[in-house]
Swiss-Prot record:
This is NAD kinase. The gene is nadK. PANTHER family: NAD KINASE. It is found in: Cytoplasm. It comes from Levilactobacillus brevis (strain ATCC 367 / BCRC 12310 / CIP 105137 / JCM 1170 / LMG 11437 / NCIMB 947 / NCTC 947). Its EC number is 2.7.1.23.
Length: 267
C-alpha cells in the first residue's frame, strides 16, 4: 500500500507531515504522491478539500484520511498528537473504508462552447458579481420557481454542515444519497415569491438553474471558481463517483455535529 502526504503550508502542519513521513518510512510504508492508495491530509477540512480536487481523477482508486492541526473538522478524524497511532493503522491497513456522496456540476455556456463538468465534495454556489440574481429553477426539467435574491447553494450531505448550514439549510446525514438546495437571501414579497426553505432532491432527480442574465455570475465548486464565461445553465445531481475514507476509527455523524456546533461543555 502506497501513501501520499498532502499538507498545508502552516508550520504546525509541516512539522506533523515531516514526522508522519519519517514514521511511515520507518514502518516500511511506501510514500508515493503520484499513484497512492491512501492520501493523508495534514491541516483541516480546507486541506482535505484541496486534496480531493487534486486527486479527483483517481476517486475509484484512492481513500482519504485526515489529521487536523487546528479545530476539529468533519473530514479529519486524527489529531496531531496521534501520528504514531495513524502510522500503525496505515501499516496494518486491510482496505476498510466508508464512502460519501458527491455532487456533479455541469455548466452550459451561452456561447455554445463545450460544457464543463466538475465534482464538489461540499457544495456549489451561484451568485451575481453585484446586484440581485434572477434565475429560473427547474427540478427534473419542470419549472419549479423563478428565484430572485443573492444566490443559491447546492450541497452534498457532508457539505450540509458547511456553507449550506450558514444560509439556513438543513443538516443532512450522509447516508442519504441526495442533494440539497438552499436559498441565499431570497426576495419574497407580493410580486416575487420563492419557496423560501431548503429542498432535498433524491438521487434520481436533478436541479437545473438558468440565470436570466448569463453574464457577471460567480460560480463556485467548493472553494474553487469555475471559469467565468457567460452561463446559460447549470445542472446539479448526485455523482456516479463517491469519495472513500480509510475507516480506521468510527466517529458517528451526529457526534461530529454535536462536537462542532454545540459542544459537550455546553450540555
Amino acid at each position: 500500500m502506497k501513501v501520499s502526504i498532502f499538507s498545508n503550508n502552516g508550520l504546525s502542519s509541516q512539522k506533523v507531515a515531516t514526522a508522519l513521513q519519517k514514521g511511515l518510512t520507518a514502518a516500511g510504508v511506501p510514500i508515493d504522491s503520484l499513484d497512492p492508495d491512501v492520501v493523508v491530509t495534514v491541516g483541516g477540512d480546507g486541506t482535505l478539500l484541496s486534496a480531493f480536487h487534486h486527486y479527483n481523477d483517481r476517486l475509484d482508486k484512492v481513500r482519504f484520511v485526515g489529521i487536523h492541526t487546528g479545530h476539529l473538522g468533519f473530514y479529519t478524524d486524527w489529531r496531531d498528537y496521534e501520528v504514531q497511532e495513524l502510522i500503525d493503522s496505515l501499516a496494518q491497513d486491510n482496505g476498510q473504508s466508508v464512502s460519501y456522496p458527491l455532487l456533479t456540476i455541469q455548466v452550459e455556456y451561452a456561447d455554445g462552447t463545450h460544457p464543463d463538468q466538475a465534482l464538489a465534495l461540499n457544495e456549489s454556489t451561484i451568485k451575481k458579481v453585484s446586484g440581485t440574481m434572477v434565475a429560473d429553477v427547474y427540478i427534473k426539467d419542470e419549472l419549479f420557481e423563478s428565484f430572485r435574491g443573492d444566490g443559491l447553494c447546492i450541497s452534498t450531505p457532508t457539505g450540509s454542515t458547511a456553507y449550506n448550514k450558514s444560509v439556513g439549510g438543513a443538516v443532512l446525514n450522509p447516508r442519504f444519497n441526495a442533494v440539497q438546495m438552499a436559498e441565499i437571501a431570497s426576495i419574497n414579497n407580493l410580486v416575487f415569491r420563492t419557496l423560501g426553505s431548503p429542498l432535498i432532491i433524491p438521487a434520481d432527480e436533478w436541479i437545473r438553474i438558468e440565470p436570466a442574465d448569463p453574464t457577471d455570475n460567480v460560480l463556485m465548486c467548493d472553494q474553487l471558481g469555475i471559469e467565468g464565461r457567460p452561463i446559460k445553465a447549470i445542472m446539479y445531481r448526485i455523482a456516479r463517483q463517491r469519495i472513500a475514507f480509510a475507516e480506521y476509527r468510527h466517529t458517528h455523524f451526529w457526534q461530529r455535529v454535536e462536537s462542532s456546533f454545540i459542544g459537550r461543555e455546553n450540555a
